[in-house]
Amino acid sequence: MKIILVNNRFKENTEKKAQEIAGQLSALNVEVIIDNGLDEPYAGTVDFIMVLGGDGTMLRAARRYGQRAIPVLGVNMGTVGFLSNIEINELAEYLPLILREEYSLEARMMLEVAVFQQQSLLTRVFCLNELLLRSNSPRMLSFALEISGQKLEPYRGDGLIVSTTTGSTAYSLSAGGPIADPQLDAFIVTPVASHIINKRPLVVSPEREISLHLLEEREAIIGIDGQIKMDFGAENRVLIKRAPHPLLMVNLKAKPFFTSIDRSLQRQ
């Protein structure tokens, strides 16, 4: 068996814990690859990915490995663990189940984001939570949204979020978007501080494609899962669609979504 341990190199406790777990697994004849984000994603064949950290580390792991149909387990060592299934102090209890592959998988839809300059593709990124288009200055943006070729009336405001249902409890929620069942495949389109009062969040079929471009020359940026940022101008266009493969999230124990999210939000 070969396992990738993904950790956060900016947090010393996850670096140390990754080395400790790697030693334990090696003693059980498990080959271990440690990924702290410095190098390119490991390209070889692996059986399992264990993510040590919080939601940010899980989002990075999803971008790097989510399109390879490898089971991914989130082990929470951070303050926010919406995407984790177990806590670090539970790992010893559940490790035998991992090695025997006795767990269930939950498929989470991911986004495929393609950014163009005129007709040329600049970059293609996969993400689990959301794409954000927002102004990079105090001025509002004016931008166009198309859904599978259907042109909507122009938007004006601070920006727009296109999220998965997994991402519905992240930035989209704070902007007034709905909480969506993560087992549902859909796009959640949420305006950010819309200047047009009747622009409401949309729930869109994953079979559609969403296109965004600016209507004026403004300083804008695109953010991917809160971790990747790129400049976005009037000559750019972004196309969002469902990624070819979902993220396969490992469930070792029951973690009821609506009960968990309700408790988490009540504590905030």
UniProtKB/Swiss-Prot annotation:
Function as written in the Swiss-Prot or TrEMBL entry: Involved in the regulation of the intracellular balance of NAD and NADP, and is a key enzyme in the biosynthesis of NADP. Catalyzes specifically the phosphorylation on 2'-hydroxyl of the adenosine moiety of NAD to yield NADP.
Cofactor(s) for this UniProt protein: a divalent metal cation
Residues involved in NAD(+) binding: 55-56, 60, 129-130, 156, 158, 169-174, 193, 227
Record organism: Syntrophomonas wolfei subsp. wolfei (strain DSM 2245B / Goettingen)
Entry EC number(s): 2.7.1.23
Keyword hit for DNA-binding: no
UniProt protein name: NAD kinase
Active site residues according to the UniProt entry: 55
GO annotation, cellular component aspect: cytoplasm
PANTHER family: NAD KINASE (PTHR20275:SF0)
A molecular function GO annotation: ATP binding
Reaction equation(s) it catalyzes: NAD(+) + ATP = ADP + NADP(+) + H(+)
Family of the protein in this entry: Belongs to the NAD kinase family.
Gene Ontology process terms (BP): NAD metabolic process; NADP biosynthetic process
Subcellular location: Cytoplasm
InterPro entries reported in the protein's UniProt record: ATP-NAD_kinase_N, ATP-NAD_kinase_PpnK-typ_C, NAD/diacylglycerol_kinase_sf, NADK
